[in-house]
């Protein structure tokens, strides 16, 4: 948000109490502020439901452990605080729910964090759900790192500058998002979401290979489609598979299930398998 512009309504649980607004949580010497020792997760409340909140609360703890932080908050405590925080907003408000851990101090190795300095907060803020109008994609020149080079098995803040530069480059060429490949040239995901294609009534999605986070919403969509009798194949995809697909759609926590309406110069319409995935997810969320 631009300097001087108000933040949306925000409540954060930090240091044992709820605080309103965009409160400061780090100092200039904080390890996370300059060496990126932070993790987060993102969940959603919309239309009075909070799907898979338990899984998001568990995942932030797993991410913390991966980043050598101490996950000092139980998943049950995260969930209880989340439900308490939701009560501070209008009942029909769409919210983004973001639990976080970060290191306050360096350890004896200086660059490495001190696990005993782990801090945490839970922030909830108003973030309207996006209309299912779809968006355009292209191929990014940037690549996803592997587990040997970055902590891609955690939802770590340090991963997102790579996503950001991919988005900026694609946006400069007139696209809303982009497909990002792994170092072998296979499509991994979009810059901000997991990816699905459909061809001849079969859904395909990149198989988790250690270069992208196997999203909670992704896993939920796969399960729902399979339970409904739809064939979903986790496999290796090249960009040509996207170019020749009957449908392309995305899954992610922020926008849930969304259609892709253009790949490069080729226009696409929201298709039956995208609509099925979205309908199934909404039914699951409201069950």
Question: Which residues does each PLM region occupy?
Answer:
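Helix-start/capping segments and mature chain N-termini
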Residues: 1-84, 102, 108-287
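Ordered, amphipathic secondary-structure segments that act as subunit-interaction surfaces
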Residues: 82, 88-100
């Amino acid at each position: 948000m631009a300097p001087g512009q108000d933040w949306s309504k925000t409540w954060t649980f930090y240091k044992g109490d709820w605080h309103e607004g965009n409160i400061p949580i780090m100092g200039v010497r904080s390890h996370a502020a300059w060496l990126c020792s932070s993790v987060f997760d993102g969940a959603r409340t919309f239309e009075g439901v909070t799907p898979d909140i338990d899984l998001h609360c568990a995942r932030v703890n797993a991410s913390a452990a991966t980043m050598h932080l101490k996950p000092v908050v139980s998943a049950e405590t995260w969930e209880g605080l989340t439900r308490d925080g939701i009560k501070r907003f209008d009942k029909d408000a769409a919210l983004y729910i973001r639990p976080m851990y970060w290191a306050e101090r360096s350890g004896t190795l200086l660059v490495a964090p001190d696990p005993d300095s782990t801090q945490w907060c839970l922030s909830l803020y108003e973030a309207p759900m996006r209309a299912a109008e779809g968006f355009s994609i292209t191929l990014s020149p940037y690549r996803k790192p592997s587990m040997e080079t970055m902590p891609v098995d955690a939802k770590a803040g340090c991963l997102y500058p790579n996503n950001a530069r991919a988005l900026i480059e694609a946006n400069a060429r007139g696209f809303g998002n982009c497909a990002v490949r792994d170092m072998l040239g296979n499509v991994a995901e979009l810059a901000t979401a997991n990816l699905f294609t459909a061809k001849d009534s079969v859904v395909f999605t990149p198989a988790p290979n250690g270069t992208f986070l196997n999203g909670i919403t992704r896993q939920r969509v796969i399960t729902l489609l399979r339970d409904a009798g739809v064939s979903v194949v986790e496999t290796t995809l090249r960009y040509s598979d996207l170019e020749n697909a009957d449908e392309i759609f995305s899954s992610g926590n922020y926008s849930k299930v969304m259609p892709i309406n253009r790949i490069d110069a080729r226009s696409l319409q929201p298709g039956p398998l995208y609509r099925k995935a979205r309908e199934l997810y909404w039914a699951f969320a409201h069950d």
